[in-house]
Structures are given as C-alpha cells and as structure tokens.
C-alpha cells in the first residue's frame, strides 16, 4: 500500500509540474499574459480542491479504490488531451477536468493508508507516501525542462509521456488495493468495533472541531506558500535570472528535495515520542 500510494503521489505531482517549466512556451503559442497563465493553474487547483469533499463522501459509500482508480484514469486521459489542445480555452477546460481527476485521490488515499498502516508506524508510513510529492515535483520539472527547454521538443510531449504511466497505475490501483485491511492481531478489535453502535459524524461537526480547524488553517497557509513557489519558480528563473534548458528543472527541484529528509525524520520522531502537538508547534 505504501509503495503504490507513493507512486501515486509521484504521478499526481509530475502531471501538475510538467506545465510549470513550459508556461512561457505555451504562453507564446497562445499569446497569453502571466495573468492568463496563472489562470490555467488556478482553474486546475480550484476543481482539485472542490472535488475532494464530494469524492471523499462517494468513496465512503461505494469504495475508495474504485474512486481512486477512476480518478487516475480521468487524470491520464485529460493529461494526454492537454497536449492536444489547440486553443487556450480548450486547454483550460481539459486542465479543469484533470483537477477533478486528481481530487478523487486525496481523501480516499489517506483513508486506505490509515487502515493499512499499523498505528505505531502510521506517521512514518504516511511521510514515505507523501515524499512521492517531492519526487513527482522534481520529475515533472526535469522532464519538461529537458525535453522542451533544452531539446526543443514541442511542449505537448511531456503531457503525452506522463499520461501513459498514470493510466497504468490507475489500473493497478483497482487490481491491487484492498478495502478495510485487517492486520494480524487486530481481528477481534475490528469485529468488536463493527458490532457496536456506528456513530455518524456530520460535516457540521467536522468543521466545528477546533483541532481540525487549526489543521485546516495551518495546511492552507503552508500549502499556499509552497504552491506559489513551485508554480512560478521555473518561470522566474527563466524570465528574471536567465536560466535555460535543464538547469531550470534542476534548480527548481532543490525545493522539493529539501523537504524529504525533514519529513521522514520528524515523522519517525513523532511515531517514537507521540508528541505531535509539540512537534507541530516547534516546526511552525
């Protein structure tokens, strides 16, 4: 489970960041301003964010692995068709659909990984899964900058390439993943929990939970800053610092690579000490 979800996050972020190094090239082809280029990213993240709650609810009802698999297939197809777009409006619509496909992954993935990973190793397990984001960000940067900026290939080629492994992994998700994984020694506890009264939690209770609200705010501020950097850093290096070719992808990749050691070290520390609140406070 950890391995396949790790690969999933690699592809999730690679299919996003292949766009960033070639923003200028696409802008020249369609005659776009930086504002319009920003819109292409914004529409993707808007549909990605909006889709997460509905897909989480659907996953709870019909099965998480089905939602993840279908989402990845949609992502693969929309990534491929992104490279076929002949107008900016068409590109926007396709990227919006790609965002919807990615929105199907986030909630169901964490639900399944939480079920599958033992509690004593849950933080480090999720940290390993999440480190796929850094690998994917770096891979997307390097692929686009190497093929398009250095080799002079058409900007669509990275989209065509990334669609293939994304489609394959979508199929693997459906064939490999299992719902409600029961680990050895936990059968009795799981059976007792399922026999007892099942408490239903409403969305109102979720959004009124103080700890969850604090987590929402913390995630929003940190993720916002992170995505501003990974979205515009390649374009900044090209336009303002004069970098060319694969060096754009390499330098941009330093940001995600730097996050991996810290994530794994502090995740392991949290599993050992259980001092989640103190660690979060210290890091913030």
Language model features with spans:
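Extracytoplasmic gate region of multi-pass secondary transporters
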Residues: 19-20, 210-263
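Helix-breaking motifs and short loop linkers at transmembrane-helix boundaries and internal kinks
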Residues: 31, 63, 84-90, 152, ...
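Cytoplasmic membrane-interface "Motif A"-like loop-to-helix N-cap segments
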Residues: 61-71, 271-284
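Cytoplasmic helix-loop-helix junction between adjacent transmembrane helices
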Residues: 94-135
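Helix-loop-helix hairpin linking two adjacent transmembrane segments in secondary transporters
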Residues: 129-179
């Amino acid at each position: 489970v950890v391995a396949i979800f790790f690969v999933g996050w690699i592809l999730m972020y690679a299919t996003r960041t292949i766009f960033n190094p070639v923003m200028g090239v696409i802008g020249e082809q369609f005659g776009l301003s930086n504002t319009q280029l920003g819109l292409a990213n914004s529409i993707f993240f808007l549909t990605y964010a909006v889709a997460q709650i509905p897909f989480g609810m659907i996953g709870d009802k019909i099965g998480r692995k089905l939602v993840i698999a279908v989402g990845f297939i949609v992502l693969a197809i929309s990534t491929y068709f992104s490279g076929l777009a002949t107008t900016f409006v068409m590109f926007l619509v396709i990227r919006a659909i790609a965002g919807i496909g990615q929105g199907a992954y986030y909630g169901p993935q964490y639900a399944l990984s939480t079920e599958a990973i033992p509690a004593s190793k849950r933080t480090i397990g999720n940290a390993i899964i999440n480190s796929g984001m850094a690998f994917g960000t770096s891979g997307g940067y390097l692929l686009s900058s190497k093929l398009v900026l250095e080799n002079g290939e058409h900007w669509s080629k990275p989209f065509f390439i990334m669609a293939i492994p994304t489609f394959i992994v979508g199929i693997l998700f459906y064939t490999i993943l299992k719902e409600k994984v029961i680990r050895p020694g936990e059968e009795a506890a799981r059976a007792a929990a399922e026999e007892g009264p099942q408490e239903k939690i409403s969305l109102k209770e979720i959004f009124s939970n103080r700890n969850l609200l604090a987590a929402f705010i913390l995630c929003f501020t940190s993720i916002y800053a992170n995505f501003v950097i990974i979205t515009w850093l390649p374009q900044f290096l090209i336009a303002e610092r004069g970098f060319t070719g694969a060096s754009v992808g390499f330098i941009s990749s330093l940001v995600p690579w730097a996050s991996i050691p810290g994530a794994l070290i502090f995740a392991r520390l949290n599993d050992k000490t259980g001092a989640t609140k103190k660690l979060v406070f210290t890091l913030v």
